[in-house]
A protein has these predicted regions:
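Bacterial N-terminal signal peptides
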Residues: 1-7
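Early extracytoplasmic/lumenal segment of secretory-pathway proteins
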Residues: 13-78
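Short amphipathic alpha-helical coupling segments at ligand-binding clamshell hinges
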Residues: 30, 173-174, 208
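Conserved glycosyltransferase catalytic-site signature
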Residues: 49-50, 190-191, 209
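A beta-strand-loop signature enriched in Asp, Gly, Thr, and Trp
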Residues: 208-217
Length: 217
């Protein structure tokens, strides 16, 4: 899960204030449909994730935020742990959203995959059959992998999932092996990783799915 939605407070009957770190036209279309169906106006305050969280914290109970939308469960879990959300789960959400895509204080509205990109010219497709994240530690990929820095929330959530499934020690060993397999020091965003493969700097990249579609559009 990667794009998440969290209730902060109670809106006025005729409007709802959304603090959003997302920047997609599809969201605007969703808000417009909501207003057309309910008559409730949607006010959107856009900004960077950290800036929005800082504002909400500083404003406290006086915050005008009703809903907070951001990317990745990792961000929401940390904000939730700070006590910034309230239990607002409705029966509708429980019916529509699978339990692994929500908590008692937030729910997912979309999901994205963090996948493995590869160069078809330099990588044999047979080497990728059944490939898992864990396989990125295989020495055969030495000098061939690019991925964002470890402080990126997408990578942090990926590591968290590996810890959940494989334990801390195994994940620590995996991380060290992946570092040894890197084609370069981590830099740039997800698009930069994909471009590195296209440019021949690496054979394998880890990045979210939608970036390729955006780059091709």
């Amino acid at each position: 899960i990667s794009i998440l939605f969290s209730l902060i407070g109670m809106s006025h009957a005729n409007e709802v204030n959304i603090f959003s770190a997302r920047h997609y036209d599809s969201d605007v279309q969703l808000y417009e449909k909501f207003t057309a169906k309910t008559g409730i106006e949607v006010n959107v305050i856009s900004g960077k994730d950290k800036a929005l969280q800082k504002r909400i914290k500083e404003e406290g109970i006086d915050s005008k935020a009703d809903l907070y939308i951001t990317a990745d469960a990792g961000r929401l879990s940390a904000f939730d742990a700070a006590g910034m959300f309230q239990n607002s789960m409705s029966p509708v959400i429980k019916t529509v959203v699978p339990s692994n895509f929500r908590s008692k204080n937030w729910t997912g509205i979309a999901k994205r995959a963090r996948i493995i990109y590869y160069s078809p010219e330099r990588v044999n497709i047979n080497d990728l059959n059944g490939m898992r994240y864990e396989d990125l530690a295989d020495p055969k990929w030495k000098g061939k992998i690019v991925i964002r820095q470890s402080n990126n929330i997408y990578n942090q959530s990926l590591v968290a999932s590996l810890i959940k499934n494989n334990g801390k020690k195994a994940t620590a060993d995996w991380s060290k092996s992946v570092v040894k397999n890197m084609a370069r020091t981590p830099k740039g965003n997800d698009r930069a990783q994909i471009l590195a493969v296209a440019a021949g700097e690496a054979d394998i990249a880890v990045a979210n799915t939608y970036y390729l579609a955006l780059m091709l559009s």
